[in-house]
Amino acid sequence: MGSPAHRPALLLLLPPLLLLLLLRVPPSRSFPGSGDSPLEDDEVGYSHPRYKDTPWCSPIKVKYGDVYCRAPQGGYYKTALGTRCDIRCQKGYELHGSSLLICQSNKRWSDKVICKQKRCPTLAMPANGGFKCVDGAYFNSRCEYYCSPGYTLKGERTVTCMDNKAWSGRPASCVDMEPPRIKCPSVKERIAEPNKLTVRVSWETPEGRDTADGILTDVILKGLPPGSNFPEGDHKIQYTVYDRAENKGTCKFRVKVRVKRCGKLNAPENGYMKCSSDGDNYGATCEFSCIGGYELQGSPARVCQSNLAWSGTEPTCAAMNVNVGVRTAAALLDQFYEKRRLLIVSTPTARNLLYRLQLGMLQQAQCGLDLRHITVVELVGVFPTLIGRIGAKIMPPALALQLRLLLRIPLYSFSMVLVDKHGMDKERYVSLVMPVALFNLIDTFPLRKEEMVLQAEMSQTCNT
């Protein structure tokens, strides 16, 4: 600043306010670089050649910030007493301290400032997942969410810490959207055993598996359970399982049951057919019989075989041919054994009133007689003029006499004897009997009850 001799002249050139301040400063503290700096470790001070000897506040430099100063003297006096500096931080940084600094008379700035990197709130860790960040929670850091196996990310996969100290997008979550897995067995095919229409089929109950938390509901079955007897046909079996998020997993398979069949048989004309099981399945047996007055020719029973063919020959019902030329009454009766019931009407003369009335009533009830397999045998007269008649066939007198003697039928009075299909004497009558009373008695016979069932199935009835 020149020699001491010229200092008074120079002081006269300074502004009055600055001159006053200079006069108040002790000369011993006025030395180059004596100004105190409020800078922190990340702040840098500097000096300019033109005012390095000015003993005022140190120059300001804020890391990650910009400084705008206005000195009262203008020009290069930006650290002189009274200088005001505005501090602004760069994007992504925030100011810690006052945004306005003033150079004070103690050669110190009015505050200490620093620009620190902005920081967003710590992200919440999503359940069943997590996230990875490039630079923690600081400004411009990118964080990417991820989920554990079995879970799907819902929301923004990537978020960024913004200048407003908030994360971009909405926080993500991990939800269980993957259905549980369940595997069913393969198709079950079975063939029914002989004389059966169902098959017992078993399998292991499938277990579900969840890729998320492994917690599942009970397995729900739709269809018959394992170990059941399955009828013929295709059967759909379905298993369903849910996880805790109500995702549903299903699997299906079929149980196929086949029944070997030979094809349906038909009852012979004027006959009956009774079959076991379903009538035409492997192992089923069909039995045949004929209505009254007809004899069965062919196989009385046929079985459906494993080669799907029926055993035996086709049965037919032929009109019964009674042989009246046999020598004994026993041989005559044997022809009716298990085939026909006999109602033997005996009279000493054809003019007998009871005989004529009874014969008239029986003729009117012919349908009931046929329905109950009853053959009427007439014994008319007394030996040697005795006549035996079965329908249109006439038996010899000697055979007719044997029949009377075998069954102990009175020779000189009207009487009737009812013989069942096993040759047993079931009832005797010495007077007229109404056909309905006769039929009611026969309908109580055990064998007759079986016949009634078959006739009902064949819709065989008498309308009169």
From Swiss-Prot:
Detected in fibroblasts (at protein level). Retina and heart; less in placenta, pancreas, lung, liver, skeletal muscle, kidney and brain. It comes from the Eukaryota. GO terms for cellular component: autophagosome; cell surface; collagen-containing extracellular matrix; endoplasmic reticulum; membrane. Keywords: Cell adhesion, Disulfide bond, Glycoprotein, Proteoglycan, Repeat, Signal, Sushi. It is found in: Cell surface. Disulfide bonds join C57-C85, C69-C103, C89-C115, C120-C161, C147-C174, C262-C304, C290-C317. This is Sushi repeat-containing protein SRPX. It comes from Homo sapiens (Human).
